From Swiss-Prot:
Source organism of the structure: Salmonella typhi
Protein name as it appears in the record: Ferrochelatase
UniProt cross-references to PROSITE patterns, sorted A to Z: FERROCHELATASE (PS00534)
The organism's taxonomic lineage, starting at the top: Bacteria, Pseudomonadati, Pseudomonadota, Gammaproteobacteria, Enterobacterales
Listed GO MF terms: ferrochelatase activity; metal ion binding
Gene this protein is translated from: hemH
Residue spans crossing the bilayer: none
CDD domains, per the entry: Ferrochelatase_C (cd00419), Ferrochelatase_N (cd03411)
Amino acid sequence: MRQTKTGILLANLGTPDAPTPEAVKRYLKQFLSDRRVVDTPRLLWWPLLRGVILPLRSPRVAKLYQSIWMDGGSPLMVYSREQQQALAARLPDTPVALGMSYGSPSLESAVDELLASDVDHIVVLPLYPQYSCSTVGAVWDELGRILARKRRIPGISFIRDYADDGAYIDALAKSARESFARHGEPDLLLLSYHGIPQRYADEGDDYPQRCRDTTRELVSALGLPPEKVMMTFQSRFGREPWLTPYTDETLKMLGEKGTGHIQVMCPGFAADCLETLEEIAEQNREIFLEAGGKKYAYIQALNATPEHIDMILKLTAPYR
């Protein structure tokens, strides 16, 4: 009997191919056209997206990407490739593919790559520690569309999230401790998660609870008193209310109140990207310092650290 051959698909959001208005426009069009991301009725959304948002937003976002672009591409792509390569090196007999919900490499190209390696079973790991319909749900939807077009469908194991997984929490705690050792222990550790519309949570998305689960476990692992940790939400988009408190408004308030030293971690990002390196490490640093804060440090995402690769190995082990 033929032994089952398993492959691993690491999934993430995606990135423009280049820091140019044209490339950013292509990427944003695909991203903001997904109903999992924006569910505004299409008759209202298409004219707004194509006539206002894409023309105005693309040049501005391209400049932000230019400020963080690396020799190998966007930070998200560079670190995601490093994750893929590091995992493949630890699992020489297991094909590992990388796929993005938007942009390239696509999820479909990742599935095709694994099927070309003659796998019978694919372990899908969306690199979103906290489930949300707008991230993990988008991977699930696209995977279904891809497989619906295939004659041969492999077995699928889909890891929904890992918000309170022990190896994940340990990796975050180690990263925080290293930052404390480098910069000194802060007056406050701010845990900034990507926001979602409040309405999504009201309609059943358990993302806020999964963020609270991560925060609870990380605070416990670090042994910090609750008053030295805050949880906030960043990157809001549009006019409807999003999860609160907002990161930028909180940092301004803390600076004005006299909080001297803050360190910020973004536990929901598996790889550094525009939202961490530009929004948190740069924009929000300025907000805090201009409001009266004295010291601000951003704690990098787990990226391709050995602890992060160990975590991925442990998460996928039961399905390999």
